[in-house]
Amino acid sequence: MLTNLEIARGAKLLPIEEVGRSMGLREERHLEPYGRHVAKVDLCAIEDLSERPKAKYILVSAITPTPLGEGKTTTTVGLGQAFSHIGKRATIAIRQASMGPAFGIKGGAAGGGYSQVVPMERLNLHLTGDLHAVTEAHNMLAAMIDNHLYHGNGLGIEPHSISWRRVMDVNDRSLRNIVIGLGARTDGVPRQSGFDITAASEVMAILALASSLEDLRERLGRIVIGHNREGNPVSAEDVRGAGAMAVILKEAIKPNLMQTLEGTPALVHAGPFGNIATGNSSVVADLIGIRTADYLITEAGFGADMGAERFFNIKCRISGLEPDAAVVVATVRALKAHSGRYQIKAGAPLPEELLEENPQDVLAGAENLKKQIENIKLHGVPAVVAINAFPTDHPSEHKAIEEAAKEVGARCAVCRHFTEGGKGAVELARALEETIEENERERRRGGGGSFRFLYPLEMPLKQKIETIAREVYGAEGVEYDAEALRALEGFERAGFGRLPVCLAKTHLSLSSDPALKGAPRGWKLSVREVRASVGAGFIYPICGQMRTMPGLSAHPAAERIDLDGEGNVVGLF
């Protein structure tokens, strides 16, 4: 089979104006082309399209993934393409790629095989410059903070309390912890700081959650960068940095329009970290996309306990949109890993025994699948399982997954969209169509599921944390470090108690221990500290060790990426 890059490069793409017209977007009013195959979509489209019918809203989530990922983006793309094979129109909405992982071990974020967003080089490298704008806006605030300290510190900011570091879109472990302001007195105030990757910036989370340019400006002003000598929070507005940040982001808030290999419209916008932020694409992309097709399909990072929970309880609160169904992507290899009998490591070959026929291990690991389906249903949303099929799978293993899904009342579809494109996900599209129609019929009869949040915003922060830990992760309790309890009390006093919570934990387990596979029981969630993203609008407790600046592997993808003699990119995947 051809590589992802070879497949993408061989595609015949539609002019982006034609893609926009298929969505009801007008070239002269709504589209700002960036070349022939990418365009920005003006936010006036939200109002202009508001009288059009709403699409059915589908979330693509997954079981707890292995370090290799289980194919959510590929499934999102394949499903979007599949609907056209059954006479329906679809728009997909996905996150923007970060160049750090693209040059690291993870690779790009355009999907794969015959289910990709194209041009894939554009998506994975720069696109329209949104990540650079986020980087510049973030670092502008960092410069304003240090400039304020240098010029007398009129706000009385405690330098040790400053939590606003700098960012860049490169995996570079050597910048995690640095000392700034060294040299002469004129070189600034020395203090310890560091760099995070751009996707971990609160500015990126704000870009994803802002519902308008005005909302973006307000959220930027609410960013808390530290506290003063009296212990009161100091904001980006206080250091007079928010206005300049908004100017830098004025174009970045507009979603990017691209297309799949089969011409399905793709809105590509924002890329917040899935660990410490929502891991979802932007609210504005969904507000536009929901009026452009019969189905709007979006994805959420990592497993249903992570991205989907945040999608439901954070993103949907802001957008006001309610999902009609969710897909839980599962693979045979990941479910075998969840049996606890295999180890999968990023960058290492798969264990040979993992590829042998073993439906018993699939069933053992399927406890994770069943819990993730339950996590979707907790929110009143029906779930359909997508088996992302690999050539090494066996029919008996697919049957084991189908049996596990049936136990918890979920339909199941085997998908081969990686090798077949949209045709390979038609079974999934039909299963979703039937599931949504069935749920609507049940609702009309007084039954069926209705979308609901897991907790009310009035609930105290501590209780919100414990609700997620118990109901979503399956923990029997929560243990707090003293520092975490003090932070929670401080946030309640500061008026942040009505914010939703976004628990930062490993994506490799339902628990906070990446080594615990399946659906572990009898464990307690440990919260060691709690931080606030007040601008983005959530509190994030830290559970376990979180890296916000990745490092490169011994042999990163960057070693293989180059230009050929004709100036074409080679080695990108």
From Swiss-Prot:
Keywords: ATP-binding, Ligase, Nucleotide-binding, One-carbon metabolism
Cross-referenced InterPro entries: Formate_THF_ligase, Formate_THF_ligase_CS, P-loop_NTPase
GO molecular function: ATP binding; formate-tetrahydrofolate ligase activity
PROSITE patterns xref list: FTHFS_1, FTHFS_2
GO annotation (BP), single: tetrahydrofolate interconversion
Catalytic activity: (6S)-5,6,7,8-tetrahydrofolate + formate + ATP = (6R)-10-formyltetrahydrofolate + ADP + phosphate
Binding site for ATP: 66-73
EC assignment: 6.3.4.3
Pathway: One-carbon metabolism; tetrahydrofolate interconversion
Superkingdom assignment: Bacteria
Family: Belongs to the formate--tetrahydrofolate ligase family.
NCBIfam families according to UniProt: PRK13505.1
Record-given protein name: Formate--tetrahydrofolate ligase 3
Organism from which the protein derives: Rubrobacter xylanophilus (strain DSM 9941 / JCM 11954 / NBRC 16129 / PRD-1)
